[in-house]
Amino acid sequence: MGISRNRLVPGLVGLAASAAIVLPLGIGMPVSSATAEENAPVQTLNVDYGTTTGDFYGGSSGMLYGLGDEGSPTDAILDGARVQVTSQKPADGLQHPSADVLAVENQFFNNGGEELVVNLQDWYPDWSYNGGKRPGDTRSYKLDVDPNDAQYGTYTDNAPNDRWDFDEVLEVVMNKILANTSHPDNIVFMPFNEPDGGNWYASGDNASADIYKQFLTDWNDAYATIQKVWNQYKSGEKTNVNGVKPTADHALIAGPGDSVWRANRTKALLESSKAANTLPDVIVWHELGNGSLKNYRSHYNQYRSFEQELGITPRAINISEFGELRDMSVPGQLIQWMSMFESTKVQAQTAYWNYAGNLNDNMARANSANGGWWLYKWYGDLRGTQTVKVTSEHPDSVDNLQGVAAIDTKNRKATVLYGGANDATKIGANIPVTVHMTGLDQSVFGESVDVQVRENAYTGPDGVAATPRVVNVLSDQKLVNGTLDVTTTSIDRYAGYQLVVTPHQDVATSLDNAENGRSLQAIEAEDTTLSDGAKAYTKSDNTGSWGNFMFSGNGDVGNFKNGAKMTWNVDVPADGAYRLQLITAPAGFPGVNHVYVDGKSVGDLNVPAELALKEAAKWKYRGSAEIVLDGLTKGKHAITVEATDLDNESDKLLLYQVSRGDGTPVDQVTYPASDMRLDSGAVLAYDGNGTNGFANLNGGRADVFAHAWEAGYQNVTIAYNAAKGAHFVLSVNGQSAATVTAQSDGAQTSIVRVAFSEGINQLTLSGAAGVRVASVTTARASESDSKAIRFEAEDAQLSGGAKVQKDDASDASGKSFVAGLGNQFVTNESGKAGYGDQTRVEADANHVPTVAQNNKGTMTVTGVPAGAYNMVVRFSNDAFIGSHSYNPQVVDLGLQVREGDQEIARGSFRYTYTEKHFMNRSVTVTTHGGALTLGNWDEVGSRKAAVSWGVAPNVDSITFYPITDGNVIDSVSGVTVSGEGVSADGKASLKVGETLSLNASVTPDSVADKTVQWTSSDEQVATVDEHGVVKGVKAGTVTITATSVADSSRSGSVEVTVAEDSEQKPSGGDGDNNGEQTGKPDGNTGGQTSDSDAGADSGNNQKHMPLTGAAVAAVAGVAVLLAGAGLLLKRLRSRS
């Protein structure tokens, strides 16, 4: 079921490949649309799987300063997003206080990164560089000491030495990098950034200007210096601290780096550098404005024509900055850029509008996803595929439907990523989109296919986006001449969609709707009922303005001052618990909004602080606040959000179903094998053994990136097929959690209770061939949270500069926290009044901060037993160093854990906008039972972090969750019924009035719930009580069955013959035999074993496994294309 705005409305039904209308399973006929928008004409995206366009390039996942420090972002976030390329500053560069190439390189390359670009001019502290003027020869740099000597690269002013100053800078930064990097061959060096703008060589596109001629000369000189230093390390003349030598023929160099496409200047550079043998390896320019969505392809084609004209081998291209503030975090916007760049096979990096370390606003909080992150995750999943031709009805246009499509022949999977469907309102609400696919090869997909469509809604740059929901399903659809149409209604232009086609599977994918506890509804804040001063504001759709964030629905609610209210009259689809989410932004500080349901107070939304350091961000940089509403009943309810003195502005509200309210799991999400990221030999299997669509681990790995709203325990249920004794390993966020051993042959499940981090968790399954995974399901298990060991920071043993700080305006628990861990920055209140936290770190002109190093603060806790833990730190960080024209100069802070003198863990902790606002960040730690001391022992300049000032974040609390709780819980493989007098062939007898005691044994031993339910096939012949005691009633034969409560498909039984007192007992087995009988799942006896013991190749696994597509396939001859009838995301507009 898709999101509904305000109420569920049956909508358009999808069209099958044969163009026949088919009905969603279990849903009635569609009714008339409730609003005019829902009668919007269908928009079509044409995907030709018969025309491949090359190997998937993956370059559109690039970032400029996407990484802030090692661990910022986290591994799960970084690996999930599969960032292919990022540009960072040089070692010890001063342009920004974080994002040092040497600090981030190992984490980047360990998590799917392929290429690091270094902006060499970012050595300078000022923007524009050197005051915007080309340097001359006024300095002498110290170059005659080791590159890691503190004096190396320092300079003396007013000391000309007959050498261009920037040439010396290039030598300094190249030596600092090559003396320390572990990945020289994967680094690209860019000597100039925006030379056409404010950085030294501005001439517009006039390639004849004297200043541009100077640029051509300087390009050749810079090229020569970079190659000189490279060759010194390659030859061994100079050495690297890690013993790593460059192996490539030459250093990779990128340029020119212009701020826009400059045709004349670019052609002149190609001509000049070809003649001088200094051609760039990577051609670089920016595509920042929304006009690039229509003009980029012409720029690309013109550039390629220059290469052809000049006889130059095609160069790689990196669009080193793309997009506007309004594009970041918005799936329906980002996909438009991705489609252009992937189709032309170039790298492209999102622009750096705000701060480093959050993937350019494409993640949320410390470790959570926003809508942008999920799109990057989907895009990263396409590695190893081939792209195919995609044609939009709106080619080369701004803000319209676009997509990327690929075919994975090894895994027999076709994927389409799309979004951006728009109309004259510039909102694009409720537009039906048909993905028209042709060329689907029957040799790959067979005669019939399954389709899944997932929806990824916009939640703001810092608003949490949960796992995208399945909103459209097609099962066992016959292909007609390789053609298939799938129609899904798009919620709005901001949303993104993932469509996956596979051969028909034995893994059924269900719609995420009220029936399985996964419904979702949404409403624009401005469409709620406003009262007591709250006001709706109409906003621009942001076209043509790079400096504005996106406003969902082109509006929001402000003037939300004390007592103001917005009320959502919502039709709840089913009884249960629901999570209300408010997409909102205060002015830089945290606070609360009160929440009422039908006039009754139900608690507060804890609204987090958000970025407010500049006009473009204040009240516009939206995050999210959540509260669970327990016990909502089906039907209409009024949910009211009431303002306090926080004065936050709000964009939209969402209502997520948490559970069905009938004891079903909380926050349950299923990830089928076809949605997993397979690597190192793991592959989707289609061999006809009842495991079609399962992931055969095959010695490789299958990764799931699972969302959790909060830190704590989750049940991870793995459904799989394997031979008895086969095993595989479950790891969570890089930590081994459990080795799972198959307890029987065939289909089964195992459950591991694991401590999750708040946000994204990387679950990895690794095992041998023959272990075939159908799905992984996660569900909250909060009852185990009591196993965690929690410390309030102020209760720890403090020393040095550590001190307890009380702040009633903070969102720290108890309004107290510990500050002063590690070194301490010297700060003052110098920020602009009214724009968030005014605290600034004192720093010199080079952004070097003043640090107190003589009183390192620590906090020590005891009582944590030896073991592996997910350590959750609730922290704050308001460190802000220096100034910049548009980038907040924030930094990550480091926290380390020591046991005795041994460091056992460390982490980077992001900027939280103010010391008053606390976030959660997890660090994996293994202890030996001793006292644990937390602080920061890094020495200034140690390069253990991008900014190694030895300063730690403020700490509110620390919670240690053991990685797992309990042993692996396996599924029931069989039920055996036995008892005195039961024969080997499962028969027993007794007389009327007599009793017989039966026992039921549930296997394997690792089953958690071994209770059974006893039943009699005819209680007029014999009854059985809850303890298995059978009593004869009258003569006859009856079957007594014990059914597993944990798995009702598993049972065992015996046949009991009841005789009158005068009758002779029938022969059939020795009464002293005490034989046992294992019943089949259908209750049959006769000495046959249950299906779980029949072996993986018995052919019966599909019949009895609960995760097959049998139920859907049984709808004879009907292909179900779920594209409507209340199952799609609807937006009910209340204004024109």
UniProtKB/Swiss-Prot annotation:
Thermal behavior of activity: Optimum temperature is 45-50 degrees Celsius with gum arabic AGP as substrate.
Superkingdom of the organism of origin: Bacteria
PROSITE patterns membership: CBM6
Topology in the lipid bilayer: Single-pass membrane protein
pH dependence text: Optimum pH is 4.5 with gum arabic AGP as substrate.
Region described as Disordered: spans on this chain: 1049-1104
Pfam families: Big_2 (PF02368)
Gene Ontology CC entries for this record: extracellular region; plasma membrane
Catalytic residues of the enzyme: 194 (proton donor), 321 (nucleophile)
Main location: membrane
Keywords assigned: Carbohydrate metabolism, Cell membrane, Cell wall, Glycosidase, Hydrolase, Membrane, Repeat, Secreted, Signal, Transmembrane, Transmembrane helix
UniProt biased composition (Polar residues): 1087-1103
Family classification: Belongs to the glycosyl hydrolase 39 family.
Protein name as catalogued: 3-O-alpha-D-galactosyl-alpha-L-arabinofuranosidase
Annotated source species: Bifidobacterium longum subsp. longum
The organism's taxonomic lineage, starting at the top: Bacteria, Bacillati, Actinomycetota, Actinomycetes, Bifidobacteriales
